[in-house]
Amino acid sequence: MIVRTLEQARQSDRRVKADNWESVRMLLKDDNMGFSFHITTLYANKETPIHYQNHLESVYCISGEGEVETVADGEVHAIKPGTLYVLDKHDKHLLRAFSEMTVACVFNPPLNGKETHDENGVYPLEAETIME
């Protein structure tokens, strides 16, 4: 059984920071669950271009407000607490946080832990592994 708290993970290498967000990676590839689970905070008034070419992701909004825009068709969807969006087609998208947003994210295949977006908004398929 795996038991860890958000605070424990936040105080460890499982907390990864970037310019527009920070993510606490609660479950990772080495946990052998077949997916990774993250609690991510998106900073207010920021836009993040993302294109997960190697991963599928589901995102559930816990707090805050923003929107997600699919680049291919310009369709915009509001995000508020209780909203789930799923990137099931490796959708290139723009994620905008109007206020600080906290979201729960599930990735398949799972992340190793140290991933941040490259210049194209992509996470690498294999990145540095967090060692505990």
UniProtKB/Swiss-Prot annotation:
EC number: 4.2.1.108
Gene3D superfamilies: Jelly Rolls
Protein name stated in the entry: L-ectoine synthase
Pathway in which this enzyme or protein is active: Amine and polyamine biosynthesis; ectoine biosynthesis; L-ectoine from L-aspartate 4-semialdehyde: step 3/3
MF (Gene Ontology): ectoine synthase activity
Superkingdom of origin: Bacteria
Physiological role: Catalyzes the circularization of gamma-N-acetyl-alpha,gamma-diaminobutyric acid (ADABA) to ectoine (1,4,5,6-tetrahydro-2-methyl-4-pyrimidine carboxylic acid), which is an excellent osmoprotectant.
Gene assigned in the entry: ectC
Presence of the UniProt keyword Lyase in the record: yes
NCBIfam families per UniProt: PRK13290.1
Keyword Zinc-finger: no
Catalytic activity: (2S)-4-acetamido-2-aminobutanoate = L-ectoine + H2O
PANTHER family assigned: L-ECTOINE SYNTHASE, PTHR39289
Keywords: Lyase
A GO BP annotation: ectoine biosynthetic process
Family: Belongs to the ectoine synthase family.
Primary enzyme class: lyase
Originating species: Hahella chejuensis (strain KCTC 2396)
